[in-house]
């Protein structure tokens, strides 16, 4: 049996990391650094939900029309020509993500992606518990809601987007509530996940903690 350290540092080995956590906890930044460090393909699973939200908007489908959204989720195709990162799309994505039929349809896409990619880090809310329960390393990132709101605020400002900190905090708290209370794959760490609170840590400090964990892990 190949140990975790060998899988991580030997690029000829298959190696999968699941990276879960709430909105604006730092997953994206951390995931990209880890992907570069360990030669992994990085994929943000929320993109499939944001793409579906965008498709609903562009095709004028009301998100309360559940049957129509479910049908659309069966035909999902990722299109990189549009900005899927704005808050409106994110909020719609959060609403439709609570619907179990939609999650099941989109998870099929994600599960196949994990299975067909030898070295991957996939970021999301339920990767370690649902999409890739057999991942070699499961990481759960969390942080204080106020800290997360401030991070998102700075990110949006850096992109030149108008935003209000209190509104971002309100939306983060609302998303947390939806994620934790949904019946289909609620947000929670896998039982064997490495849990890291990033409230007082930089992205590089988190990467260092993950790297040390890999080096010292005894399988």
Curated annotation (Swiss-Prot):
<dbReference type="InterPro" id="IPR003136">
    <property type="entry name" value="Cytidylate_kin"/>
</dbReference>
<feature type="binding site">
    <location>
        <begin position="21"/>
        <end position="29"/>
    </location>
    <ligand>
        <name>ATP</name>
    </ligand>
</feature>
<dbReference type="InterPro" id="IPR011994">
    <property type="entry name" value="Cytidylate_kinase_dom"/>
</dbReference>
<dbReference type="GO" id="GO:0036430">
    <property type="term" value="F:CMP kinase activity"/>
</dbReference>
<keyword id="KW-0808">Transferase</keyword>
<dbReference type="GO" id="GO:0005737">
    <property type="term" value="C:cytoplasm"/>
</dbReference>
<keyword id="KW-0963">Cytoplasm</keyword>
<protein>
    <recommendedName>
        <fullName>Cytidylate kinase</fullName>
        <ecNumber>2.7.4.25</ecNumber>
    </recommendedName>
</protein>
<dbReference type="GO" id="GO:0005524">
    <property type="term" value="F:ATP binding"/>
</dbReference>
<comment type="similarity">
    <text>Belongs to the cytidylate kinase family. Type 1 subfamily.</text>
</comment>
<dbReference type="GO" id="GO:0006220">
    <property type="term" value="P:pyrimidine nucleotide metabolic process"/>
</dbReference>
<keyword id="KW-0067">ATP-binding</keyword>
<dbReference type="InterPro" id="IPR027417">
    <property type="entry name" value="P-loop_NTPase"/>
</dbReference>
<keyword id="KW-0418">Kinase</keyword>
<dbReference type="GO" id="GO:0036431">
    <property type="term" value="F:dCMP kinase activity"/>
</dbReference>
<dbReference type="Pfam" id="PF02224">
    <property type="entry name" value="Cytidylate_kin"/>
</dbReference>
<keyword id="KW-0547">Nucleotide-binding</keyword>
């Amino acid at each position: 049996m190949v140990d975790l350290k060998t899988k991580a540092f030997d690029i000829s080995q298959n190696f999968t990391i699941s990276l879960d956590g709430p909105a604006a906890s730092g997953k994206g930044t951390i995931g990209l650094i880890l992907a570069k460090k360990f030669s992994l393909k990085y994929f943000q699973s929320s993109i499939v939900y944001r793409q579906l939200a965008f498709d609903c908007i562009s095709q004028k489908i009301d998100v309360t029309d559940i049957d129509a959204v479910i049908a659309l989720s069966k035909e999902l195709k990722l299109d990189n020509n549009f900005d899927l990162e704005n808050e409106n799309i994110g909020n719609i994505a959060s609403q439709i993500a609570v619907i179990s039929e939609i999650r099941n349809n989109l998870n099929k896409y994600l599960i196949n992606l994990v299975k067909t990619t030898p070295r991957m880090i996939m970021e999301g809310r339920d990767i370690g518990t649902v999409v890739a329960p057999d991942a070699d390393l499961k990481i759960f990132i969390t942080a204080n809601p106020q800290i997360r709101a401030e991070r998102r605020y700075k990110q949006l400002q850096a992109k030149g987007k108008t935003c209000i900190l209190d509104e971002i905090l309100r939306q983060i708290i609302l998303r947390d509530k939806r994620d934790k209370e949904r019946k289909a794959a609620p947000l929670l760490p896998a039982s064997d996940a490495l849990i890291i609170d990033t409230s007082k840590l930089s992205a590089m400090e988190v990467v260092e903690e993950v790297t040390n964990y890999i080096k010292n892990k005894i399988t």
